[in-house]
Amino acid sequence: MAPGLVVGLNKGKVLTKRQLPERPSRRKGQLSKRTSFVRSIVREVAGFAPYERRVMELIRNSQDKRARKLAKKRLGTLKRAKGKIEELTSVIQSSRLAH
């Protein structure tokens, strides 16, 4: 933000910043509709992995810390484990609402 001064730390000509189109790399990690649809179909057909079923059972029995520890052991990092716990908790809640 140059104020048009000739000297000083903020010196320089006043310009309007160019609006550049967003780079494709900025989309990295963002889920597309197609990908989310395919994942939902796979989840429907294949079901849950054995460790996921065990984690869900632990969550149902309100052993959240144990469930987190198991998920971390299986997935490698606590961040991934927290995401998985969140996903499985939402699955449990939606199944409760369905019945």
From Swiss-Prot:
Is Ribosomal protein a UniProt keyword of this protein?
A: yes
Q: Output the Gene3D superfamilies linked to this UniProt entry.
A: 60S ribosomal protein L36
Q: Which residues cross the membrane?
A: none
Location relative to the cell: Cytoplasm
- Spell out the PROSITE patterns in the cross-references: RIBOSOMAL_L36E
Additional record remark: There are 2 genes for eL36 in S.pombe.
Q: What family does the database annotate?
A: Belongs to the eukaryotic ribosomal protein eL36 family.
Q: Kindly provide the name given to this protein in its UniProt entry.
A: Large ribosomal subunit protein eL36A
Question: What broad taxonomic lineage does this protein's source fall under?
Answer: Eukaryota, Fungi, Dikarya, Ascomycota, Taphrinomycotina
